[in-house]
């Protein structure tokens, strides 16, 4: 009987526990429902009379909200309590839009910089292309400037594109011809010339000409036949003007063609820059190194030393002539 009473008591206790849990659960659900009702009323008030209400939350949603809710201002995050028309969300949306706009702005700035650099490069490329598109066959050569019986005649290979376009000898900024000539003191009275003064060389007892008259972008564009023809024409010029000291040949390649025209042979391997044992049209020959920027195999110092040697001989002859008068 005691066992029966115990079992009955246990059953009553179990039923009592279930009843208590049900009451507690009902009270909690009612509490959440009341809170949801207050929330809906609050939303209606803040929406300024808008009839559209937020979706009623289920018990599980309320329980989820209870887990993540925090006491504090409306700016604090709640997982399920999201109202699209609230000031808080509008602020967050505005902030997000501003962030995206800023990122896009920075990205656009980077793109614009890239486009600007590309534009500069394309402008330089188009300018270079335009220069290269000049047909040398349509260009004119530069004139010779030679006086009767000069002290010396300077001989270049042929006019470059820049020289042809400007109409003056050795006009390219990469060519150091005029700088080396000035530094050698070949001109009288310590004068200093630029390519614009090529016509003034005869006033200093000097002349200037080229092996070939045809302009080209490079000496490699010249044909062997026209260089040999140029050597023969140069030979006649030298005999015609009769330089007193000799010829200054601005580059070994020029002398190779002149030597071949004279002898029918190639220049010997024993060649040395400076005064040559052969004469050309009864004139002495001095071979210097090309002043072109492409002649990078020799130092500027060596090039200048050769200019100085030739200038010394010319100036020595000038003094002799002056004293003779």
Swiss-Prot record:
<keyword id="KW-0227">DNA damage</keyword>
<dbReference type="GO" id="GO:0097509">
    <property type="term" value="F:oxanine DNA N-glycosylase activity"/>
</dbReference>
<feature type="compositionally biased region" description="Basic and acidic residues">
    <location>
        <begin position="1"/>
        <end position="11"/>
    </location>
</feature>
<dbReference type="GO" id="GO:0006285">
    <property type="term" value="P:base-excision repair, AP site formation"/>
</dbReference>
<dbReference type="GO" id="GO:0005634">
    <property type="term" value="C:nucleus"/>
</dbReference>
<dbReference type="GO" id="GO:0097507">
    <property type="term" value="F:hypoxanthine DNA N-glycosylase activity"/>
</dbReference>
<feature type="compositionally biased region" description="Acidic residues">
    <location>
        <begin position="34"/>
        <end position="43"/>
    </location>
</feature>
<dbReference type="InterPro" id="IPR015637">
    <property type="entry name" value="MUG/TDG"/>
</dbReference>
<dbReference type="InterPro" id="IPR036895">
    <property type="entry name" value="Uracil-DNA_glycosylase-like_sf"/>
</dbReference>
<dbReference type="Pfam" id="PF03167">
    <property type="entry name" value="UDG"/>
</dbReference>
<keyword id="KW-0234">DNA repair</keyword>
<keyword id="KW-0378">Hydrolase</keyword>
<dbReference type="GO" id="GO:0008263">
    <property type="term" value="F:pyrimidine-specific mismatch base pair DNA N-glycosylase activity"/>
</dbReference>
<comment type="similarity">
    <text>Belongs to the uracil-DNA glycosylase (UDG) superfamily. TDG/mug family.</text>
</comment>
<comment type="function">
    <text>Removes uracil from G/U mispairs in ssDNA. Also corrects G/G mispairs. Does not catalyze the removal of thymine from G/T mispairs.</text>
</comment>
<dbReference type="GO" id="GO:0097508">
    <property type="term" value="F:xanthine DNA N-glycosylase activity"/>
</dbReference>
<dbReference type="InterPro" id="IPR005122">
    <property type="entry name" value="Uracil-DNA_glycosylase-like"/>
</dbReference>
<dbReference type="GO" id="GO:0004844">
    <property type="term" value="F:uracil DNA N-glycosylase activity"/>
</dbReference>
<feature type="region of interest" description="Disordered">
    <location>
        <begin position="1"/>
        <end position="50"/>
    </location>
</feature>
<keyword id="KW-0539">Nucleus</keyword>
<protein>
    <recommendedName>
        <fullName>G/U mismatch-specific uracil DNA glycosylase</fullName>
        <ecNumber>3.2.2.28</ecNumber>
    </recommendedName>
</protein>
<feature type="compositionally biased region" description="Polar residues">
    <location>
        <begin position="12"/>
        <end position="23"/>
    </location>
</feature>
<dbReference type="InterPro" id="IPR003310">
    <property type="entry name" value="TDG-like_euk"/>
</dbReference>
